[in-house]
């Protein structure tokens, strides 16, 4: 896929504008009120415990080394295409704070991230840091990294707010009434990032078809909608749309 040349200096500028860089799949950078948030970062060559599978078909538009100073890393759940050990280890010696769902802290501390740098949250909990508000909200999905210990950690969608802006990130989720509930309580949103690229009838409960993502954007009262969960890793089986 074509990649736009990114001006990191302009992206880092602290002003009242909302700046976004999509890194492919569900990873993106967010500059809100001058604070830099990195969401579900995966920079490895494969989103799998075995590097032969779910391989990246192109490099991200920015390398780890090119990233600006990251204030926060936000994680939706612990699947390999959203929580990447090698990427997390890059931040061991940095001061980045991690915002994660319940149970995910254990993964990070196992990878030598200091516990005091990690904030774990349950659905509907709120945390405020440096002018930025993080709200953990529901998602319809599941978790687990080995197929033996499913659903021992929580999965979540997220709201990120400043005084001027508000965004919503679905994480991985099937379509259900939680989008309407979130939209009624916290909408409208300047931008919503919605799972739209893993559509298959077998996975309807845990991923959205594009038309369902459009309905979710409507439920959330989105001003802008960015479809995510596509465009970076080898695709699996899809249901053809007619």
Language model regions located:
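Pre-active-site segment of Zn-dependent metallo-hydrolases
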Residues: 2-17, 23, 27-78, 85-90, ...
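Beta-strand-turn-beta hairpins that frame and shape the catalytic cleft
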Residues: 15-18, 32-37, 126-135, 161-167
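Divalent metal-coordination and catalytic microenvironments
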Residues: 30, 40, 77, 134, ...
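Active-site environment of divalent metal-dependent phosphoester hydrolases
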Residues: 79-83, 105-107, 125-128, 142-144, ...
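Helix-loop-beta element that forms the nucleotide-linked donor phosphate-binding surface
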Residues: 108-122
